[in-house]
């Protein structure tokens, strides 16, 4: 009986980790001079190692997702270019 309860609890813990929502991390920067804005990415495919393309006031950067909401994913699109955008 105890082993069944343990197995169920272990399964629930595993599912909560796998099914938890992921977000771009919130940026600690609130503003950026236009001459310093650059995009390292425009879409998630531009990033490596499971990181996402996240938007910040200083441009788009590859960041690892977190379980805390607050950041935003880069919109990408045809107008997005990598490098300095000024």
Curated annotation (Swiss-Prot):
Disulfide bonds join 24-54, 32-58, 41-53, 42-80, 47-62. Keywords: Antibiotic, Antimicrobial, Disulfide bond, Secreted, Signal, Toxin. One of its GO terms (biological process) is defense response to bacterium. SUPFAM superfamilies: Elafin-like. GO terms for molecular function: toxin activity. Its main location: secreted. Coiled coil: none annotated. It is found in: Secreted. Expressed by the venom gland. The keyword Ribonucleoprotein does not apply. Residues 1-20 form the signal peptide. Residues 21-66 form the WAP domain. InterPro entries: Elafin-like_sf. One of its GO terms (cellular component) is extracellular region. Contains 5 disulfide bonds. Has antibacterial activity. Belongs to the venom protein 11 family. 01 (wap-1) subfamily. This is U15-lycotoxin-Ls1d. The lineage of its organism: Eukaryota, Metazoa, Ecdysozoa, Arthropoda, Chelicerata.
């Amino acid at each position: 009986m105890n082993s069944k309860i343990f197995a169920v609890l272990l399964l629930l813990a595993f599912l909560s980790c796998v099914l938890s929502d992921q977000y771009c991390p919130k940026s600690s920067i609130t503003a950026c001079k236009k001459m310093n804005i650059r995009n390292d990415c425009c879409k998630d495919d531009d990033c490596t190692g499971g990181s996402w393309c996240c938007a910040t006031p200083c441009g788009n950067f590859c960041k690892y997702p977190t379980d805390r909401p607050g950041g935003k994913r880069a919109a990408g699109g045809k107008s997005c270019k990598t490098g300095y955008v000024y």
